[in-house]
């Protein structure tokens, strides 16, 4: 498997989530990946209140980050603050999605809908 360089981010995944793809089945993990574009202020506030401090920022490709980790929303069966591998880099579960699918993760982005 080849490494892909995406705006300075090295990943082992052959397909990466993009705004135009919208949804991918990650071939290296059991997750289906989608993206969402919502205000992160409450998510960041709650994370900091839990004692996990890092810089919130948006990567040049529009992926929302907490420190060096991709912000992810996941099913409640995946503990909050867990680390998960995504096609866009290592993610941290800071948010929840409402889908019943426990194998779906939503990646926080600044990709306008």
Predicted segment positions?
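Gram-positive cell-envelope targeting signals
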Residues: 1-23
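Solvent-exposed, well-ordered loop and adjacent helix/strand elements within mature globular domains
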Residues: 20-113
């Amino acid at each position: 498997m080849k490494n892909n360089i995406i705006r300075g981010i090295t990943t082992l995944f052959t397909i990466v989530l993009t705004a135009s793809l919208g949804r991918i089945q990650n071939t290296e993990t059991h997750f289906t990946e989608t993206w969402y574009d919502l205000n992160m202020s409450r998510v960041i506030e709650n994370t900091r209140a839990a004692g996990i401090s890092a810089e919130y920022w948006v990567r040049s490709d529009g992926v929302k980050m907490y420190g060096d980790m991709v912000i992810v929303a996941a099913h409640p069966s995946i503990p909050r603050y867990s680390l998960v591998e995504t096609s866009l880099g290592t993610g941290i579960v800071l948010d929840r999605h409402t889908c019943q699918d426990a194998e779906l993760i939503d990646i926080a982005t600044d990709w306008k809908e």
